Regions:
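Beta-strand-enriched, solvent-exposed domains that form extended recognition/catalytic surfaces
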Residues: 1-18
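Terminal, non-catalytic protein-protein interaction segments that mediate quaternary/complex assembly
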Residues: 17-22, 133
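Nucleotide-activated chemistry modules centered on ATP-dependent adenylation/adenylyltransferase
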Residues: 26-27, 31, 36-43, 47-94, ...
């Protein structure tokens, strides 16, 4: 189920040598605990952050609520559970791509001057270069400069570390879902973002909602799951779940009309710029 090297890496734009190992364990655990629960595995680790350790049973319980006919097993066994709570120095960070969901949340919390966090998790090895990631960095840097906020970028192989095609054969048959959509992506993003949050002593990581009330979708990025995630002194808010996509567009349009806020939406997934031809581009243009 894992890549040939059985190795997951994460690269940050700052020195992580002073961050405790119990916190640095969070990114890998945020990607493999769901696997352990699905396939009833035990995960052993030397040390883990106390807040994260205590949030895992709640996240597991949320998955069980989604998939009532499937029994989740597995657990985490840690030699040491360490309390890493610390003073808060900055109010917020935001998982940011420049899309509708992330931009809406930015406009709702911009008074807190969030650190924007963009992650590229589709590398196969450390030397991989991506034109898409470079385009993301360029666009988000412009956005950050226009709005006088900071941006941090993360490079990883968490999306290729576990081979989705192999896991999906099981999940499609038993749960009618896929690994990335149903179990991995938001927890993977929050896991690496938690290191940024710890480094800057951030209180809250915001993640924009993908869906809203009334949409019965078994997606890992769900308020029942995301809001339970916690590391050290940082929590998570799954934002704007009460808004439909059209209502989010209204927030963006109103910000432009009323305050001339600079917004350049980037909605085309895995492309250097909006193609203006795909379903998502057309849908966004019509909504605007």
């Amino acid at each position: 189920y894992f890549n040939d090297k059985r190795e997951m890496f994460v690269e940050f734009g700052f020195d992580i040598s002073a961050i405790p190992k119990s916190v640095l364990a969070v990114p890998i655990l945020s990607n493999i605990m769901q696997f352990a629960w699905l396939f009833d595995c035990l995960v052993w680790i030397e040390s883990v952050d106390k807040q994260f350790y205590e949030c895992l049973p709640r996240i597991k319980r949320s998955f069980q609520e989604m998939y009532r006919n499937y029994s989740f097993g597995g657990s985490l066994i840690a030699a040491k559970v360490i309390d890493n709570e610390h003073s808060v120095k900055k109010e917020s960070a935001l998982l940011f791509t420049g899309g509708v969901d992330a931009t809406t949340t930015f406009l709702r919390i911009r008074d807190t001057h969030p650190i924007l966090i963009d992650t590229f998790g589709w590398c196969n090895d450390r030397d991989d270069e991506s034109c898409v990631f470079k385009a993301d960095i360029s666009a988000i840097n412009r956005f950050a400069e226009e709005h006088c906020v900071q941006a941090e970028y993360i490079k990883s192989n968490f999306a290729t570390f576990i081979k989705p095609e192999k896991v999906n054969k099981v999940l499609n048959r038993k749960l009618h879902n896929s690994w990335w959509f149903g179990f991995q992506h938001s927890l993977a993003f929050l896991g690496v973002a938690s290191i940024v949050a710890f480094y800057y002593h951030i209180r809250t990581i915001y993640i924009g909602s993908s869906y809203t009330f009334g949409q019965a979708v078994n997606c890992v990025s769900d308020p029942r799951i995301d809001r339970e995630f916690a590391v050290a002194s940082c929590n998570v808010i799954h934002d704007a779940y009460e808004l439909s996509r059209q209502q989010k567009i209204r927030v963006i349009v109103d910000a432009k009309k009323e305050a001339d806020v600079q917004v350049n939406l980037r909605v085309c997934s895995f492309k250097e710029e909006n193609c203006n031809q795909c379903e998502k581009c057309f849908r966004t243009m019509i909504e605007i």
